[in-house]
Amino acid sequence: MHELVTVLEEFGYTWFSLDRAYEDLTYRPDGVVHVVVESSVIFVEVDERGHDPLHPSYTPLKEQTRMKALKDVAMRNGKVSVVFIRVNTGRLSEVLPQQVETVREVLASIHSSKPKGYHVNYVDYRDDHVHVLESEKKESGIDSVKKFHTENFDEKVRRIRASDLR
């Protein structure tokens, strides 16, 4: 069982694999699991290969469109809160202990504050990546964008970028 799933179970959350599409969407979200908590849905996503905004196959607009579609479907189905926790890693198996701990802290905050609306939490993303979403926050209907960096973030960015150059 993946370490992120273990963290979700610590909070008593029921989780669902995202190896399938969410509700009536025709594509599956990135990552590991989604969690339904009362009238909220939490998407815990592992962005394999780091979603480097300088990489030619990645566009921030695509990411925003996908997340907004997930949010719209959830809200249409009666959810009052949609939260994304996005973890930047090389591969699913490379989520590091510090990142798992950061996800645990974000989940604890969500669990205690029960936020309403649309929130995005980035774990170990470059500032320029997060800035794209922050700058479009109002237009996208996002209530908050938060970023968290673990202590090994800079080293991990170098490693991911080196693997992209191969």
Residue locations for each model-derived region?
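Nucleic-acid endo/exonuclease domains
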Residues: 1-166
